[in-house]
């Protein structure tokens, strides 16, 4: 472990995380899996203007609503609370309701119209005889917001099949412009500059791309009750721009060494003209010998 006296940069405590939940509502489209995304308000305190999946903070009422939800035998209390939070947020933000009647039939547009997005969610559903479909919500991934950011969340990315017969309607205050998009299409539009998405969304869409059907996604997540991946990314500078990395990527280790508390202060540029300080007593010296075996150099 690196001693604090060896660090090049002053340390600071990362902002605390807040528990939240988000859900990828999926459907099978003509060209493959499609995911429901919406644009965040331009005045939002976190990721303004970004296209995201519906979600938000977990409330105490979500944990108190277990008795109003179905659950899988293997589904933990934590995962059920997260699923209920995601169901609630999907309704409040997009008017999508993952719930059933006592006879097993799915909630209809008439059921949705009878509920208020502003009133307590679980109590309304109970009064209307609706049971939340927590058993239909699965854990895909676990993201923890990067340590350098001022607002941080500890958030599972959940997945569920979009209920048939329902259409998303944005609340026009937190979320706007709901759209169905294939993961590869969303990534291409982002690269073209017309569809802003943030790092965890990018990496999640990349990992969804190989799946050909919604069933394939849900089966992969149902294989066990653990996320398919967990990440708290790290950030540095590359060619003068912000660059973020997951744990399996080589720059992550260098960033963890130079900035263990996650500050975005270190430059990652690969250069051979002079040594690059990593710690007060450690430098990276790169030889200019690029090749198949050495990459950009050693």
What are these regions (language model features)?
Residues 1-277:
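N-terminal leader/linker segments that precede catalytic domains of diphosphate-processing enzymes
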């Amino acid at each position: 472990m690196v001693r604090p006296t060896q660090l090049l940069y002053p340390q600071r405590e990362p902002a605390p995380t807040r528990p939240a939940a988000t859900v990828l509502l999926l459907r099978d489209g003509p060209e493959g899996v499609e995911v429901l995304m919406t644009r965040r308000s331009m005045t939002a305190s976190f990721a303004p203007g970004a296209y995201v999946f519906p979600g938000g903070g977990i409330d105490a009422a979500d944990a108190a609503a277990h008795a109003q939800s179905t659950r899988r035998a293997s589904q933990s209390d934590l995962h059920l609370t997260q699923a209920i939070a995601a169901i609630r947020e999907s309704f409040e933000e997009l008017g999508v309701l993952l719930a059933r009647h006592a006879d097993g039939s799915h909630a209809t547009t008439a059921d949705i119209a009878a509920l208020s997005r502003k009133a307590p969610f679980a109590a309304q559903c109970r009064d209307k005889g609706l049971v939340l479909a927590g058993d239909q919500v699965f854990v895909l991934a676990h993201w923890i917001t990067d340590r350098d950011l001022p607002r941080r969340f500890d958030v599972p990315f959940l997945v569920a099949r979009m209920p048939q017969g329902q259409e998303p309607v944005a609340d026009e205050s937190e979320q706007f412009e709901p759209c169905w998009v294939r993961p590869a299409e969303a990534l291409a539009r982002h690269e073209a500059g017309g569809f802003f998405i943030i790092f965890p969304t990018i990496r999640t869409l990349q990992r969804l791309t190989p799946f050909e059907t919604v069933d394939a996604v849900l089966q992969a997540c149902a294989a066990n009750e653990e996320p398919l991946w967990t990440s708290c990314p790290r950030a540095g500078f590359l060619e003068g721009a912000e660059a973020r990395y997951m744990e399996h990527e080589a720059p992550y280790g260098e960033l963890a060494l130079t900035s263990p508390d996650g500050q975005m202060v270190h430059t990652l540029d690969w250069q051979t003209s002079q040594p690059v300080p990593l710690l007060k007593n450690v430098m990276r010296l790169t030889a200019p010998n690029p090749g198949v075996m050495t990459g950009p150099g050693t």
